[in-house]
């Protein structure tokens, strides 16, 4: 049985944000690198560093936190996995959902690489809906 690396990434970022950790270590793969670039460009994370321990490469993400959060479960970063190995979800560019009226983003895997919903609409291409971030 294989591992769902995208679900592992989403879970580790969500858990670190809920626990108010400053940094998260994520294994380095091509898909994680593309998703981290999107998160950095959209402003959901502050900084990314690539480290190596032996033959193992990983990313160290610095999370962006709100200063005035109250309560243990109030998170500023919500991530939800949509398409999973057991049930793939595809969409054309016209039916890509808008998250919070455009405040959040949808990450898609298209024939031209991994991109956000705005980029996919501009290029008029659809693909597999990987996750929602708001």
Swiss-Prot record:
Disulfide bonds listed in the record: none
Chief location: plastid
A single GO cellular-component term on record: chloroplast
One of the record's GO molecular function terms: structural constituent of ribosome
Entry keyword set: Chloroplast, Plastid, Ribonucleoprotein, Ribosomal protein, RNA-binding, rRNA-binding
UniProt keyword NAD present: no
Spans through the membrane: none
Location in or out of the cell: Plastid, Chloroplast
Gene Ontology biological process terms in this record: translation
Matches recorded under PROSITE patterns: RIBOSOMAL_S8
Function of the protein: One of the primary rRNA binding proteins, it binds directly to 16S rRNA central domain where it helps coordinate assembly of the platform of the 30S subunit.
NCBIfam families: PRK00136.1
The family this protein is said to belong to: Belongs to the universal ribosomal protein uS8 family.
Subunit structure: Part of the 30S ribosomal subunit.
This protein's name: Small ribosomal subunit protein uS8c
Organism name: Populus trichocarpa
